[in-house]
Curated annotation (Swiss-Prot):
The lineage of its organism: Eukaryota, Viridiplantae, Streptophyta, Embryophyta, Tracheophyta. Together with EX2, enables higher plants to perceive singlet oxygen as a stress signal in plastid that activates a genetically determined nuclear stress response program which triggers a programmed cell death (PCD). This transfer of singlet oxygen-induced stress-related signals from the plastid to the nucleus that triggers genetically controlled PCD pathway is unique to photosynthetic eukaryotes and operates under mild stress conditions, impeding photosystem II (PSII) without causing photooxidative damage of the plant. Residues 1-83 form a transit peptide. InterPro entries: EX1/2 (IPR044680). The keyword Protein transport does not apply. Residues 1-51, 65-102, 340-381, 413-455 are annotated as: Disordered. GO terms for cellular component: chloroplast; thylakoid membrane. Residues 19-33, 42-51 have a biased composition (Low complexity). Keywords: Chloroplast, Plastid, Stress response, Transit peptide. It comes from Oryza sativa subsp. japonica. Pfam families: Cyclin_D1_bind (PF12014). This is Protein EXECUTER 1, chloroplastic.
Length: 727
């Protein structure tokens, strides 16, 4: 086996040494050929042996360029044919062999480079033929979407690094909490069943499963840790949980809207549920009967990075529910339209051009005593439908303000007497009964219809009560799925107050509602303020030849049918529930059946603030007084304002024996002031009045305090009774 190895270039030899070098090279070539020849033949010539060695060296070089690994050689040897000549004969040196091998090596490199470039070109053509490029516009849109997704992903990663969660992350947390709550409820039901059957082994397994499922209940775990910290007197830990885990939000709160056009206020209760805090609003009827509240917002807490993440959620109710009452009347009673007007008590017939119209779809020549189409044979279905009953039909010529108040008091008394429903049915005529409807309408027709039979307008006052079937609230949502969760923000100001900010998702709708509400006034009240009764000012039942003009339609509502909503910012303050039995401290509610408001009485010492702040008081006299602040207001005096005040103490007590009837049970009488104003809290002013403290012995759960005030036009008594909020 022979190999051709190139040597390093050397300096050119002198001319005299060429012959000697040729001879030495030829002798060395002969000796090398003899060394490489495996079977030397002395008879063969040295030229053939040199030629074969050169051929073997070329084949070895080709194999080495192709990638074959040659046998390791300790030394590189020169195998080439050297022609020695004298004079001008050319001599092929090892440098010439090195140049030839370099050229052959560059040729193989170019071959491999061309092959690689061709393969890449064919692959590009193949890919381009099967996946054509998209247009530039689509590429730009796709690029924008990819960039936006990357930005959202980066933003989410940054927020998670900072301890904040994105809204999408919170929505996943909401779904996880709902599923966990459902599983816990099912396991607790099985646990009660196992305990009832005395299967304690299964009960133990179920308790372990409940504990494992409740690992996402951050709120429940925080409440448990708070109770443990208080029992173990670890007050620093308890303070941290109260301030950072939301435990300090539990309890009753009164809310005042930041919108000046909303004077009504809210009473809410925040309670702890699975994985969240839920705030429910209550009206006066629900507070009296311990009824269920209406959820308005939620507060979620989640553990992250050794702390707590908070997310407030506004429960936006379905807007279609607000129109359900009108739709129910229109569908079940066969009416075309129901519109609320803005007239008041005692308005005349000419002032009702924009009143509420309830047009009969099946107008014919029948008498009005037969009742409009749709009142008889109401279709029955599984949907809970309000049942209408007529309480009283009286000609308007016999109606005054006292009678209207009496009617509303009667309606309030009947709502309180829920023990015997048969008496309630006997005292009123069900509108579903055709005979009763005819008798009621005939009673009003006998006094108002002319004998000539000509067409005339019959003015009457109809008091109508709505009762839901099967104790179901047809206006309230059946579950939390009826709400839409919207992001909100909760800002804690201190331990006793916080602000709740809703998402501005319907600014235009809010402005329209506010403008509409400000115009809907019923006497001295507004339609939205009446949670207990919606007052439609004018209803026309258009028959064949007679019209019934109803100036007032009181619709009693049960179980919080008027949904209270949050818009913009609402400021909440904690309701302080007093422990003492002081009659001049605590919560009170008006005792009238149709105008229920909640007040907070507080004893104070100093000087009450006068409306005219520029007036300078020369004598700084301090005294003890009591203020009544409205927690729920109306269109006259909004929530958060002082409605009456009085100086208390022995120096300011007035005599009452022989002046006030003993039946009222007056204990003390003080001089005070009552605030009155025009609608919209315009021109507020103070009038003289008296605060009375009653013993409440003559009336069960009767009033405890009363306020008597007078103006140039009327004298009015207001009675108030204690309001006890459930723990």
């Amino acid at each position: 086996m022979a190999a051709a190895v190139s040597t390093a270039p050397r300096a050119p030899l002198p001319a005299g040494a060429v012959s000697s070098s040729c001879c030495s090279s030829s002798s060395s070539s002969a000796s090398m050929s003899r060394r490489w020849d495996p079977s030397p033949n002395p008879s063969s010539g040295s030229g053939s042996r040199l030629f074969l060695a050169a051929r073997r060296g070329e084949r070895l070089r080709v194999r080495r360029l192709a990638g074959a690994a040659p046998a390791p050689a300790p030394r590189r040897r020169v195998s080439s044919v050297v022609r020695c000549g004298g004079g001008g004969g050319g001599v092929r040196s090892p440098d010439d062999a090195d140049a030839g091998s370099g050229e052959r090596r560059r040729g193989w490199d170019a071959l491999f480079h061309d092959a690689f470039q061709g393969a890449v070109r064919r692959w590009s053509e193949y890919v381009g033929s099967h996946w054509p490029l998209a247009p530039a516009g689509k590429d730009a849109g796709l690029g924008k979407r990819v960039e936006s997704r990357r930005e959202e992903q980066v933003r989410g990663e940054v927020e998670e690094e900072e301890g904040k969660w994105s809204w999408e992350r919170w929505k996943q947390h909401f779904a996880l909490i709902e599923e966990s709550e459902r599983l816990v409820d099912e396991l607790q039901l099985q646990l009660r069943t196992a305990v009832y059957r005395e299967d304690f082994r299964s009960a133990h397994k179920l308790k372990l499963a409940i504990a494992a499922t409740s690992k996402n209940d951050t709120v429940g775990r925080a409440i448990s840790d708070l109770n443990s910290a208080i029992e173990e007197e670890r007050y620093m830990d308890a303070t941290y949980i109260r301030d950072h885990a939301g435990a300090g939000l539990l309890g009753w709160w009164s809310g005042i809207s930041g919108n000046l056009s909303d004077p009504y206020g809210l009473i809410i209760r925040i309670s702890a549920e699975h994985g969240r805090y839920v705030a429910k609003s209550y009206d006066t009827r629900q507070l009296n009967s311990d009824g269920p509240g209406f959820p308005i917002f939620e507060i979620y807490f989640a553990e992250a990075n050794g702390g707590y993440n908070l997310q407030a959620v506004h429960l936006k109710p379905d807007d279609s529910d607000s129109q359900q009452l009108s739709n129910t009347l229109r569908e079940k009673l066969g009416m075309d339209s129901i519109n609320i007007s803005s007239s008041s008590f005692g308005a005349k017939h000419e002032d009702h051009n924009e009143g509420v119209n309830m047009d009969d779809q099946n107008s014919d020549d029948s008498d009005i005593s037969a009742g409009p189409a749709g009142f008889k044979n109401l279709p029955s279905d599984s949907t809970p439908v309000p049942r209408v009953k007529i309480l009283k039909v009286v000609p308007m010529e016999n109606v005054n303000q006292d009678y209207i108040i009496k009617i509303f008091d009667q309606m309030s008394d009947e709502d309180d007497e829920n023990d015997n429903p048969e008496d309630e049915i006997e005292s009123s005529e069900d509108i579903g009964d055709g005979d009763n409807v005819e008798e009621a309408e005939a009673a009003s027709a006998e006094d108002n219809v002319d004998e000539s039979g000509d067409e005339s307008d019959i003015e009457a006052l109809i008091s109508i009560d709505f009762i839901t079937e099967d104790d179901k609230d047809f206006m309230s949502p059946s579950s939390t799925k009826a709400f839409e969760r919207m992001p909100a923000r909760l800002e804690r100001r201190d331990r006793f107050s916080f602000s709740f900010y809703t998402e501005q998702y319907s600014k235009r709708q809010d402005v329209e509602k506010v403008q509409g509400i400000s115009k809907e006034k019923v006497g001295l009240r507004t339609a939205q303020q009446d949670d207990d009764d919606l007052q439609f000012d004018r209803v026309k039942l258009v028959g064949s030849n007679r019209k019934l003009s109803v100036l007032q339609l009181g619709i009693k509502q049960h179980n919080n049918k008027v949904q209270q909503k949050l818009y913009g910012v609402t400021h909440f303050s904690r309701i302080q529930i007093p422990v003492s039995s002081d009659p001049l401290t605590g919560l009170y509610m008006t005792a009238s059946g149709f105008d229920s408001e909640i007040l907070s009485l507080q004893r104070k010492f100093g000087q009450w603030r006068e409306d005219d702040s520029s007036e300078e008081h020369r004598d700084l006299q301090f005294y003890e007084y009591v203020e009544a602040v409205k927690l729920t207001g109306d269109n006259l005096v909004p929530a958060g304002q002082v409605v009456f005040r009085a100086k208390v103490g022995k120096h300011y007590q007035l005599p009452h024996k022989g002046i006030i009837p003993r039946e009222l049970g007056v204990v003390a009488r003080y001089k005070g002031e009552r605030r009155i104003a025009d609608p919209g809290f315009q021109n507020p002013r103070w009038v003289d009045g008296e605060l009375l403290i009653l013993d409440g012995k003559f009336i069960r759960d009767g009033p405890v305090i009363a306020f008597f005030y007078w103006t140039s036009n009327f004298h009015l008594f207001e009675f108030f009774r204690r309001l006890k909020l459930p723990d």
